[in-house]
């Protein structure tokens, strides 16, 4: 119950600040604070960014107050590896001494909040989607032996399998749709054909407008 209240309070606070953007005078200032809180520092120059940020310290305090305690108690009843795409459960389980914790990173850009207070002593294994995410994790202090470059976790319906048939066809269609003035293809057609295939780079009649 206490953890549920904690999650509910966090959710209400986030929703309030997000919606407050439309409030005259103070709305943009409040949203600016939230935006600054979630800020990711520039990638370059590559440097050591392992020192905990305010966001990291806040997550650590909330975990000390019981955030994530419920999931830790549940997984201890059947000690299987914990695989999560959200950093808070991973950090909470690691802090509680759970031995096998895997965190799936689904973004190319990630903040310091994905990594616990003391990354060098943590046991969390990170599954990174791209080289940039790998370098971010390194700069946040995660040792190389706990970072695995696995790619983005796309379903087969999106990729089409090992040959990426569906993905290549979809990217080809999107590139043509995003280049109505034919400025991209005269410069980059050779590369597009090489990676996507000639049939996926053909000109097509305009598709009907769809709203999603």
Each model region followed by its residue ranges:
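Conserved N-terminal ligand/cofactor-binding loop architecture of enzyme catalytic domains
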Residues: 2-77
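A conserved, positively charged/aromatic
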Residues: 75, 114-125
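A short, charged/proline- and glycine-enriched loop
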Residues: 78-79, 98-99, 205-211
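Active-site proximal beta-strand in glycosyltransferases
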Residues: 81-84, 90-109
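A short acidic (Asp/Glu
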Residues: 93-96, 113-115, 138
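Short, conserved loop/helix-junction motifs that constitute active-site signature segments
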Residues: 96-98, 117-122, 142
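Active-site glycine-rich loop that binds ribose-phosphate moieties when present
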Residues: 104-113, 129-131
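A nucleotide-sugar donor-handling region in carbohydrate enzymes
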Residues: 123-212
């Amino acid at each position: 119950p206490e953890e549920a209240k904690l999650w509910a309070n966090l959710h209400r606070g986030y929703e309030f600040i997000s919606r407050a953007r439309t409030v005259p005078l103070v709305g943009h200032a409040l949203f600016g604070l939230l935006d600054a809180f979630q800020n990711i520092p520039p990638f370059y120059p590559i440097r050591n960014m392992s020192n905990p940020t305010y966001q990291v310290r806040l997550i650590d305090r909330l975990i000390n107050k019981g955030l994530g305690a419920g999931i830790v108690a549940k997984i201890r009843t059947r000690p299987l590896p914990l695989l999560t795409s959200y950093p808070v459960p991973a950090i909470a389980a690691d802090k509680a001494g759970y031995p096998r914790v895997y965190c799936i990173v689904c973004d190319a850009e990630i903040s310091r909040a994905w990594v616990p207070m003391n990354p060098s002593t943590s046991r969390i294994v990170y599954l990174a989607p791209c080289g940039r995410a790998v370098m971010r994790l390194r700069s946040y202090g995660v040792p190389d032996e706990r970072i695995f470059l696995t790619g983005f976790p796309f379903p087969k319906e999106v990729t089409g399998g090992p040959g990426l048939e569906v993905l290549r066809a979809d990217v080809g269609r999107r590139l043509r749709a995003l280049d109505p003035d034919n400025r991209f293809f005269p410069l980059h057609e050779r590369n597009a054909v090489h990676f996507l295939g000639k049939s996926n780079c053909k000109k097509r009649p305009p598709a009907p407008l769809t709203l999603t």
